Structures are given as C-alpha cells and as structure tokens.
Amino acid sequence: MQPTHTLTRLTVIGKLIIASSFFLSLAVQAQQCGQTAPLINERLSYMKDVAGYKAENHLPIEDRIQEEKVINSAMAQAESLGLNGESIKPLMVAQINAAKAIQYRYRADWLSQPEPGWQPKPLDDVRANIGELSTKILEQIAEELKTCKPAEMGDKAHFINTIRQHNLTSADVEAIFSTFNQVKLK
C-alpha cells in the first residue's frame, strides 16, 4: 500500500510544481507589461544635460538633422523587431518634441536662475545613452505588443504617473501616451 501513497504524493507534488510554474510565468509576464513608460522617463531624464551642453556651446535646441537621424533609425529598428515602422514615427516625434520642450524650459529657467557649479555630461555620452534607451524602448514595445493584453501595456494612469521630469508638462506626456497607443505590429 505504501507505493500507492508515494505515487499519489508524487502526483500531487508534480501538479503543484506545474501550477506554480504557470503562475510564476504569469507573474513574470505581468512584470514585463507596462514597462515602456519607465524607459521613456529615463530617456527624457537626459534632457537637462542636452540643454546644458547646447547652452554652454551656444548650439540651438532644434537640430533637424539629428532628429531625422533618430527617427529614421527608430523606424528601421522597429521594422527589424516586427513593428510597423510608420506607426513608430509619431511616438518618436512626440518624444523628440517633449525633449525639446524640456530643453527650452531649462534654457528659459537658466536666464533668471542659473545653476552655478552644475555641469552637463558630454553630449556624445548622453546621446549614446539616449540611443541605447531608444533601442530598449522599441524592444519593450515589440515584446509588450506580442505578449501583453492592451489594458496591461496601455494603462494611462500608470503611464502618466511614471513619466515625470522637471519641465515636462502633462500635455507633453499625453502626446507621448496617445502616440504610444498607435504603435502596431507588422
């Protein structure tokens, strides 16, 4: 009789392990959903350094050539990740517009309230970090579109509460959110 009890216990233990694995995979998947906003927030966190570098070197905030390069690169990367490249363009434009708005607002603030002793990071380093984050953002969006429910990745309250930067308005974040929801797979 003992072998039957042992077999029953093993069966129960096996079922518990399978159930645990299933719920663990759901928990991991849920953690991966809705993670685009923190990456966008981190990307925008570099704008003070960009503004400072440009102010220090008497460079304009508008850099159409750089903007075009960023947009074209993002569209090509998006396509390689299984995203519709055209659908990513409005999101990139919204992020660039928000980035420029942050830079303009910093420059305006510094006219009346300079920050003595603060030094921006070198622009080449900052752009490299921004480029890495842009890639991570696209990878995350592709992953979320493939594995997450729309409500998990497009939770407006979570998105808006996550993207918080000095000199970033709620209208800037709303524009990013609305274009984020337009991104599609191929």
From Swiss-Prot:
Kindly list the cysteine pairs connected by disulfide bridges. Answer: C33-C148
Which reaction does this enzyme catalyse, per its entry? chorismate = prephenate
Residue sites binding substrate per the record: R43, K54, D63, A99, K100, A101, I102, Q103, R127
Signal peptide, first to last residue = 1-30
PROSITE patterns found in the cross-reference section: CHORISMATE_MUT_2
Keyword Isomerase listed: yes
List locations, semicolon-separated.
Periplasm
Coiled coil ranges: none
List the GO biological process terms: chorismate metabolic process; salicylic acid biosynthetic process
Taken from the UniProt entry, a GO cellular component term is: periplasmic space
Give UniProt keywords alphabetically. Disulfide bond, Isomerase, Periplasm, Signal
**EC number per UniProt:** 5.4.99.5
Q: How does it assemble?
A: Homodimer.
What task does this protein carry out? Catalyzes the Claisen rearrangement of chorismate to prephenate. May play some role in the pathogenicity.
Name of the protein: Secreted chorismate mutase
The organism is Yersinia pestis
Please name the gene that encodes this protein: pheA2
